[in-house]
Amino acid sequence: MQLLPGDRVLIAEGGGLIQIHDTASIGTTTSIPPVDFPPWFEYSSPTWELQMECLYGERLSQPYLCRKTNTLRFVLNTLDTVYGLVIPIDDHLGPGPELVMLMDFHKPEGAEVFLFGYNSAFMHGDGTSDLHILNYSWPEPDGTLKPSDSLVATLDGDRWRYLPSDFDEGSGRVVMCSYNEVVVFDFATL
């Protein structure tokens, strides 16, 4: 779930349902927890909805602001595709939300943790030494898509845990935890 500008909320469910709701129509209460307050979805119908194949991983990346197009962008994935979700900042101007394919790929065996950046992603699994690195681009204004690629880095050790892991796309550094240490890998030169 992600709050959006303009009194909107974005909801992405693991089953592949993605919705945007207008929260301005939802009543407010001063009771915490609300007393006899029906669930919010009884007051709100989605203003935009897309049903796609099952989402995989954490469902949505953090939002990325694209000033050139005045949109928010999110990265999400299924078992075989990385997608970008483009949402206009002002829902009254321009086209509505759009789902674009960023990269075709097949989830490697054992890859469970997905760390998404704007143009790259990392995947790894529990107890494996393989770190899968994906590089993709967003479509140009004319719709063309630059080539994407991936590589596998084999890390020392074989006891990497699911969480916590994180990466900084700008510096090219990935932080991973084994069962007894925290390690920072630098992929800036790749």
Task: Write out the residue ranges for each language-model feature.
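Extended alpha-helical scaffolding segments
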Residues: 1-8, 12-190
